[in-house]
Curated annotation (Swiss-Prot):
Keywords: Acetylation, Activator, Chromatin regulator, Chromosome, DNA-binding, Nucleosome core, Nucleus, Transcription, Transcription regulation. Variant histone H2A which can replace H2A in some nucleosomes. Nucleosomes wrap and compact DNA into chromatin, limiting DNA accessibility to the cellular machineries which require DNA as a template. Histones thereby play a central role in transcription regulation, DNA repair, DNA replication and chromosomal stability. DNA accessibility is regulated via a complex set of post-translational modifications of histones, also called histone code, and nucleosome remodeling. Residues 1-30 are annotated as: Disordered. It comes from the Eukaryota. The modification N6-acetyllysine is found at residues 4, 11, 13. Residues 1-11 have a biased composition (Basic residues). GO terms for cellular component: euchromatin; nucleosome; nucleus. The nucleosome is a histone octamer containing two molecules each of H2A, H2B, H3 and H4 assembled in one H3-H4 heterotetramer and two H2A-H2B heterodimers. The octamer wraps approximately 147 bp of DNA. H2A or its variant H2A.Z forms a heterodimer with H2B. H2A.Z associates with the VPS72/SWC2 subunit of the SWR1 chromatin remodeling complex. Also interacts with RBP1/DNA-directed RNA polymerase II largest subunit. The modification N-acetylserine is found at residue 2. This is Histone H2A.Z. GO terms for biological process: CENP-A eviction from euchromatin; heterochromatin formation; nuclear-transcribed mRNA catabolic process, non-stop decay; regulation of transcription by RNA polymerase II; silent mating-type cassette heterochromatin formation; transcription elongation by RNA polymerase II. It comes from Candida albicans (strain SC5314 / ATCC MYA-2876) (Yeast).
């Protein structure tokens, strides 16, 4: 006997401070809900396959990163136009302005408008006419 008393406590009160429960998101250092993403993964699986907790954490981290990236670029677009609210137009400008995000997000954004673009061949003709006068 070591004289330390009960080593393995049962259901009785412990002298140690009880640990408060922490969410999966807090443990992973994320803002997006890991538990909800895991639930969606399990629910949408074809053959009710098992989903590991690390898969849900990884997917949540990727979603959070992409969201932060798009919001940062859209915020910069809104700031350039001197407005304080991000609109679908700012999202469109941010996504289409970044080559990698443009390749990733092929969706049409409602009320996003179009990007201003004039073909270079047309610009050269206009400049030549101005030079001749």
């Amino acid at each position: 006997m070591s004289g330390k008393g009960k080593v393995h406590g049962g259901k009785g009160k412990s002298s140690e401070i009880a640990k408060s429960s922490t969410s999966h998101s807090a443990r992973a250092g994320l803002q997006f809900p890991v538990g909800r993403v895991k639930r969606y993964l399990k629910r949408n699986a074809q053959n009710k396959i098992r989903v590991g907790s690390k898969a849900a954490i990884y997917l949540t981290a990727v979603l959070e990163y992409l969201t932060a990236e798009v919001l940062e670029l859209a915020g910069n677009a809104a700031k350039d136009l001197k407005v304080k609210r991000i609109t679908p137009r700012h999202l469109q400008l941010a996504i289409r302005g970044d080559e990698e995000l443009d390749n990733l997000i092929k969706a049409t954004i409602a009320y996003g408008g179009v990007l201003p673009h004039i073909n270079k061949a047309l610009l050269l003709k206009v400049e030549k006419k101005k030079g001749q006068k």
